[in-house]
Each structure stands twice: as structure tokens, then as C-alpha cells.
């Protein structure tokens, strides 16, 4: 819990395992918004019920509670924050449209990458083999990074687009996806961003273990049969 007197409460899963919680948390940190933090352990028998009791109607994390009003789903949270914090998205209208499109793509696609490379910031392993689908997802990520010519971030200033890609950068680190040139530089900038580094440090301090996210590709795909975050 970051403060005892704030307008916002963020409901999240464990930092080591919840990529969508990471995105909402990073956004609030980037905006320098004070918030209380409630962690609901993922994949527990009462997980969804606990989230619903806190206002998240889907039972999925993250949920942002703004002065009593719950907002669930990461992109909905971003859009809600944008109403009062325009730094969420790029200032230029055309770039804002691209940033929203790329962020929506992350939200709706990259299923092969997520299935074969479960989010686990503590782990270090290499994939024994990459399927064509996983390779295509990785190549698409790199294509997006290459298409954005902003410096040092995708659209110049740090924005929601960078937040959305931060958990993918951690997956590349976990599974030793080796990059070169500007893509490697951008990944390292994401991993070194202060709020990202803080999240990773806090995740390393957690003691919870979710076996389906510790074993690898086969069990990882199984673990996504019943989503716990969005």
C-alpha cells in the first residue's frame, strides 16, 4: 500500500505473475498519482469473488477504484485516466491514434507469445523451441518498435504505448529472447525505467508460487484457459 489517504485504489494480482496489473500500476506511477494498493492472489478459489467484492464486475484484475467508482480492464483504466491526465497518450492526434491501435493490438493479440512465455519476472529460462506462431508474434513486436521512430520512447515522450510493451520486455528477458540494435536498446530502456525496475524488485520479493506459470509452454497455455486479468 503506497498511501493511506488517496482518491485511487488499485486492485492487482501478484507482481511476479500479473502482466496486466503491471500495466495499470506503471501508468499510475508514471502519472505520479497517489494510490492505495490491494493485492488479490491469482488463481485462488476465491480470486474472482474477491475482485468482484471490490467492484470489478468481471472478477479480473486490474481494477481501479476512483473515489468509489470502479473501472476494470486495463485500456478502460487508461482512457479513464486520460480524461484528467493527458500525458497518458501522445499529444499529437495521429500519433495518439497509432498508440491506441498498438495498445489495442497488445490487448487482443499475441496469444502464442503469452501462451508459450507465461509472465514470470523472477524466472530465467530459454524456450526449447519456438513455434512459427511465437516467432511471428515476436517479429510483430519488433516491427512495431521499428515503426515508431520516437526517441527515447515509441512516440518521443513516455506514454501508454510504452507501458503496454513493458511486460513484453520482461518476457523477452525471462525467456532470453536475444535482440540487437535499436530493439535491444529500447528493451533495456524499458527494463531500466524506474517504475519498471521497482515493480521487478517487488516481484522478486514475493513468495507466492503458481505452478502453472513456473513450468513452461504446455502448462502456461493451460493456465490461460480461465483468464484472471485483462
Model-derived segments and their meaning:
Residues 1-131:
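GST-like domain detector, emphasizing the conserved glutathione-binding G-site
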Residues 41-43, 186, 204:
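Conserved beta-strand edge residues that scaffold enzyme active sites
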Residues 106, 110-194:
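GST-like fold's C-terminal all-alpha helical module
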